[in-house]
Amino acid sequence: MQDVTTEPAGPILRLRGIGRRFGGLDAVRDVDLDVAHGERRAILGPNGAGKTTLFNVISGDMPQTSGTIEFLGQDIGAISAPGRTRLGMGRTYQKSRLFLGLSVEDNLYLAVLGSRGGHQRLTRRAIDGEMRDRARELARAVGLERQIGTLVGSISHGEQRQLEVAMARATEPKLMLLDEPASGLSRGERLALTDLLLELDKSITLILIEHDMDVALRVAQNVTMMHDGRKIVEGTPDEIRANALVHELYLGGRVTDDGIEVTS
């Protein structure tokens, strides 16, 4: 018998005319975006481009001022961040939300407990075999099985980022949002993180908010470039590398008839 299982029709995430206003300032203006199931998408831009504001609108941490947002074909504009998590969104934040005084394992227990929904408290009695197995599985998936009993404050910044990715996976999300996960990492740590993101289950859609062009272009299949709150360019990594406007606005270059003049 032929397998007739297919992915849901249409994009997993669709934004139309998304705007976010703070007083008289448009932090995000009229953004349209379609992200396909299983796609790795980077939203790239310098500081102040509106990337994190757009992240917060998608995640539900901040309401949009205008426009519509659909996830899996459902309008989620009025759904809270926890509600979006239950629908299948996972996320990591630029500012760490880890408990540095707890072990890697205990942080994972908290993520697993949270994935079960409702108001629950982490106690030793609450930790069952299923939770323990799931925490160790998540640690193993990001290469932290040897650090499972180590206090989070004692592991490297790069390992903390890996732990955040593991915790975001606890809910088995269909879409993962990562806000500048490479921020503050050394070159080696950035490479390790990008390798990890490339090895994620290909059924998980990934949206990477990033100001580091090397990270964005290494991880993403498609890139959306933002500037001054607007989407200005969209394309594959090769198309982004070759785009004169990207060089002029992002790399500090100046477009001339002779090519791109980059200033130091």
Task: Please provide the spans of the model-predicted regions.
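Glycine-rich phosphate-binding loops of nucleotide-dependent enzymes
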Residues: 2-264
